């Protein structure tokens, strides 16, 4: 090889071609109202109790596993802790997918890391877009299962906010029996705990559930997530996880967050976010520039605007950072708004209220659409 060869040519072809996931922090911005990453808006306070930093931590910190298992109503051998749910997404691909042979399947519009993780490992992407109501297209999924080893379904779905019909989830699990793992991403399940499918683990050996402390637990900066599955799957994932996925301080704070007091505080945050979401949803429907607000079971709202690009820039210029969803299938003119404090929600409405609607053939009945939610 010539000494002048560009070192990037040594990289795998799929990595050279990869477009990385554009996280909120990568996209940047200079705002003071950050409503683009589905974080809790206020910092939580913890004091470190573990002070032994000269030793490596446990691979699976015992207290964290015990407390999360109790919280989820599962046995400890059904729980794995990792660096965020994102690592759980990757661990499943590492354990179950042969590069250049197997495929994963997901249903856009949805979370972008499923695609990025698969592309990183050279695993084929198989997409089956959701129907107009953002529910699963079961016949299309059934027709697309050849060589699929993993199916990722986000419920509540990011960025749309809707729950996936439980009957459809069961149908996918049945279709995939003996051929694919079905991973249900429950990152936002604390905002609708009654919709969790964790109790289904006893019935479906191919079911995996992804969880996180980043949302309702207000610990996005901690990078701590969980994979829930039957013990056979957990043992496989333990073969491919890093030897020390959680640092000692992370495990310390995670255990505190899962204590009885930590769980009580989490539920108080959920109640507060839910109230602010209802307020923001009602207020958005009165804004002339808003065509539609979609019902959400999470800590964000998706709204369709008459001219989302100008709305996005107007708020950006005022230090209010939202998440543009225009590039997602079926989400033209849509912006996702994280539920912030009441004051932050009020700032959003104050910035939107003066903006005009658009009178054009494509925006007829805008006034009536604004009164609707889906």
Curated annotation (Swiss-Prot):
Modified residues (N6-(pyridoxal phosphate)lysine): 215
Names of the cofactor(s): pyridoxal 5'-phosphate
Pathway: Amino-acid biosynthesis; L-histidine biosynthesis; L-histidine from 5-phospho-alpha-D-ribose 1-diphosphate: step 7/9
E.C. number(s) listed in UniProt: 2.6.1.9
Enzyme class: transferase
UniProt keyword Transferase present: yes
Keyword Amino-acid biosynthesis: yes
Alphabetical UniProt keywords: Amino-acid biosynthesis, Aminotransferase, Histidine biosynthesis, Pyridoxal phosphate, Transferase
GO MF term (any one): histidinol-phosphate transaminase activity
GO biological process: L-histidine biosynthetic process
InterPro entries: Aminotrans_II_pyridoxalP_BS, Aminotransferase_I/II_large, HisP_aminotrans, PyrdxlP-dep_Trfase, PyrdxlP-dep_Trfase_major, PyrdxlP-dep_Trfase_small
Chemical reaction(s) catalysed: L-histidinol phosphate + 2-oxoglutarate = 3-(imidazol-4-yl)-2-oxopropyl phosphate + L-glutamate
Database matches in PANTHER family: HISTIDINOL-PHOSPHATE AMINOTRANSFERASE (PTHR42885:SF2), HISTIDINOL-PHOSPHATE AMINOTRANSFERASE-RELATED (PTHR42885)
Family: Belongs to the class-II pyridoxal-phosphate-dependent aminotransferase family. Histidinol-phosphate aminotransferase subfamily.
Subunit structure: Homodimer.
Record's protein name: Histidinol-phosphate aminotransferase
Native species: Yersinia enterocolitica serotype O:8 / biotype 1B (strain NCTC 13174 / 8081)
